[in-house]
Regions:
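Small-residue-enriched hydrophobic alpha-helices in membranes
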Residues: 1-23, 27-127
Length: 127
């Protein structure tokens, strides 16, 4: 499996959230996966849970296609720039709040999580 043929906005959000969880502490804890599913559902409240699950599976395969974390981070930053251009301020803030929720999901916030959030904040808040 590879990059979804026509990735939706939800796929892109899932990619960023999964990349965050993958590269910041190296382990995707069950609590983090549950939180990702919940925040994705918040973006598309009427979606069936099976749709959210499919997006997660496809996006996880996509994240795993990259050779290393540097490539994953570069792509996540590219998508953050796209979000900055296409989302309103409230939506961009929601992305950042969701990252904070993910950081807290496993009960510990690491320096790498703080650094990732700071980097995406700088990108998303750049006018």
């Amino acid at each position: 499996m590879s990059r979804p043929e026509n990735p939706s906005a939800l796929h892109i959000l899932a990619f960023v959230y999964l990349t965050f969880s993958h590269v910041t502490d190296g382990v995707l804890a069950p609590e983090e996966l549950d939180t990702i599913a919940r925040v994705l559902q918040g973006w598309l409240p009427d979606a069936a849970p099976a749709v959210i699950q499919r997006v997660l599976v496809e996006s996880a395969a996509w994240v795993n296609e990259f050779a290393d974390d540097d490539e994953r981070l570069a792509k996540a930053e590219e998508y953050a720039d796209l979000m900055r251009q296409q989302m309103n301020e409230k939506q961009r803030q929601a992305v950042l709040v969701n990252l904070i929720l993910l950081a807290r999901a496993d009960g510990q916030i690491t320096a790498r999580e703080e650094s990732f959030i700071a980097r995406l904040t700088a990108i998303l808040d750049h006018a």
